[in-house]
Amino acid sequence: MTNHTIYVFAYVAQFGYNTSRHKDVANPHTRVEGSASILALIELNHLTKTFKGKTQTVDALKDINLQIEQGDIFGIIGMSGAGKSTLVRCINFLERPTSGSVVIDGKDLASLTPKELRQLRQQVSMIFQHFNLLSQRDVRGNIAFAMEIAGMKRPQIEKRIDELLEIVGLTDRQHNYPSQLSGGQQQRVSIARAL
């Protein structure tokens, strides 16, 4: 397998690109400038993920160090096979790292019970390349889905959906189904659901 590089771009809360925070996470000796571990909401320390096959071993992630502070918005880009999905899956422990640690809001995920891990995952949202919208639900229904599973009361859900539709600019498409939306609109539904 070719060794590809993953790049993580940090955006400040005002959505302006901050070039001083561009980081090549494949290089373990670089650190994001201006970060302090005390402020980090998400911290990856020497994160490694190795997959062992019958004939070869693949290092999908190798010694990644990264800190994400409150208000940061990150995007992960890289070539196919670079390890982007593996990185995201390790951040929320859908995939257990081979070594290293993932700390979210001061909690080392490896030390959490399954129940504590499920509770923490409710606070961490990620938007994947494929939006996985439910085709039998309209925009409102797709946004409501996670809140319904979390046990929120219907009036709270409806109020939050209205707020989210306004944020992502889909108020006029709230009763459309995924097949009636453009790719960009589907992504905005996914963003609303993550929020």
Predicted regions and their residues:
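ABC-family P-loop ATPase nucleotide-binding domain
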Residues: 2-50
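ABC family nucleotide-binding domain
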Residues: 39-195
